[in-house]
Amino acid sequence: MITAAAVPWQHRTVLLHEAVDALVQRPAGVYLDGTYGRGGHSRLILERLDPAGRLIAIDRDPEALANARSGETRIDDPRFSIHHARFAEFESVLDEAGVGQLDGLLLDLGISSPQIDNPERGFSFRFDGPLDMRMDPTRGQSAAEFLASAPFERIKEVVRDYGEERFADAVAKAIVARREEGRPVQRTAELAALVAGAVKTRERGQDPATRTFQALRILVNAELEEVEQGLNRALARLAPGGRLAVIAFHSLEDRIVKTFIARHAREVYDRRMPYATPAPLLMRAVARIKPGEAEVAANPRARSAILRVAERTDVPLPVVVGRYA
């Protein structure tokens, strides 16, 4: 277990040029970076924009905002603004900024290298630190707080469904047993050791704690709900011809993105009415891109990334019961 001694990090933006190349089709347009991180995508987007272009960025992590405003990666550009929000809340940010429709929206899901490599954030089993895992430490329940109070069945469900861990039952039992001894799990090293004892087989090249840590992070940050809500709201805010670019890092997120694009970009016929005209398509699938060998060699964390790109058509959104369908 690595301690909290200063571990230098170098954040490498995954699929940087591929995402921005696909996203920016109108240099004078208005764009949203829904997951600013350390600003890699935002910087390149700004390079591609005309003087009349505009980029709005949001991030839920206060450290990302502080870095964007005054840190080493500060962006000083009149076309740029950054706001503290979850990406599912982006519509309120646009409303406050007086923006109606977007020419492009980028989501880079998952966590950044600075978050992973900071022991105090509690995201990684490689470092000993408080078991927090919140992307926004100012609100919500930490992973330790969840494990200290959740019943066995709920812990098992989270580890099984969000971590796709086949030893979820054993992991949950070990966590609850320790809690009943009066020693609730409070640190990353404690959880990693507990999971290592509960997971009976090893996956090649993967720490036994990987799936459990992923599951808790997804739960604590409501990551899957964020993706679903953000995508549905993006559909209403993208201008005709506007692009949606989403980078996912695990199968649960990517499945949501893939299903969303397919649902709105695939012709659907009602089998009960074989001669009926299919509903007009709201989106057009543009690309599915994975990192090349060179990028994966330089940045192993890019290995699981998938970029999916879709374009909004000019078909108006149907309105159902006072809201968008």
Curated annotation (Swiss-Prot):
The SS bond pairs are none
List the catalysed reactions: cytidine(1402) in 16S rRNA + S-adenosyl-L-methionine = N(4)-methylcytidine(1402) in 16S rRNA + S-adenosyl-L-homocysteine + H(+)
Report keywords, A-Z.
Answer: Cytoplasm, Methyltransferase, rRNA processing, S-adenosyl-L-methionine, Transferase
> What is the E.C. number?
2.1.1.199
UniProt-annotated location(s): Cytoplasm
Q: Name a single GO biological process.
A: rRNA base methylation
Q: Under the GO molecular function aspect, what terms does this record hold?
A: rRNA (cytosine-N4-)-methyltransferase activity
Entry GO terms, CC? cytoplasm
Q: What is its main location?
A: cytoplasm
Q: Which HAMAP family does the record associate with it? A: 16SrRNA_methyltr_H
| Similarity field | Belongs to the methyltransferase superfamily. RsmH family.
The protein's role, per its UniProt record: Specifically methylates the N4 position of cytidine in position 1402 (C1402) of 16S rRNA.
Q: What is this protein called?
A: Ribosomal RNA small subunit methyltransferase H
- Native source species: Leptothrix cholodnii (strain ATCC 51168 / LMG 8142 / SP-6)
Report which gene this protein is encoded by: rsmH
